[in-house]
A protein has these predicted regions:
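Short, glycine/serine-rich, charged loops/turns that create anion-binding
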Residues: 11, 30, 131
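Short, solvent-exposed loop/turn elements at domain surfaces
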Residues: 32-34, 61-66
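Alpha-helical cap/lid subdomain in secreted, periplasmic
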Residues: 75-133
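Serine-esterase "nucleophile elbow" of acetyl-processing enzymes
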Residues: 18-55, 74-75
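Acidic helix-start/capping segments at beta-turn-to-alpha-helix junctions
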Residues: 55-63, 129-132
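Sec-dependent N-terminal signal peptides
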Residues: 4-13
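Charged, often glycine-rich, active-site loop that binds/positions anionic groups
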Residues: 63-76
């Protein structure tokens, strides 16, 4: 799954013809412990391009948590991001649709709005990890 994600991100990065891109990763331990930001940066470097990364990946964090997390908001507000990768807590997307509609979508929308407010040219990338039981 990580290989597909990295390939999609690299395709998006290189399709714009710029050598340097800025990517912010907001997620939790699935992104942080697996060091996805650094791995993506290394793969990008192997193509001769540069990826400037930053992240906030506290364990168990949700979109709701990131939408009010001072560190996440400050990093978004720094602006000039080309991509902001959002990763929801691993179980939430598998919950009943009513729960997801109430506890996931509004915060994904809120984060995306904040991202676009401070980074009008950014693309929000939703990264879904494998489910956890």
């Amino acid at each position: 799954m990580n290989k597909i994600y990295i390939l999609a991100l690299l395709t998006a990065i290189t399709s714009f013809g710029q050598v340097t891109k800025r990517v912010l990763f907001l997620g939790n331990s699935y992104t942080g412990v697996n060091n996805l930001p650094s791995l993506t940066q290394q793969v990008t470097a192997s193509t001769g391009n540069t990826l400037i990364i930053d992240s906030n990946t506290p364990g168990g964090h949700t979109f709701q948590g990131h939408s009010t997390n001072a560190t996440s908001i400050q990093k978004i507000q720094l602006g000039n991001w080309d991509f902001v990768v959002l990763q929801e807590q691993s179980q939430i997307p598998s919950f009943p649709i009513g729960y997801v509609t109430t506890n996931c979508y509004p915060y994904a929308t809120s984060l995306n709005s904040t991202i676009l407010q401070y980074n009008p040219c950014a693309e929000t990338v939703f990264y879904m990890t494998w489910g956890r039981e």
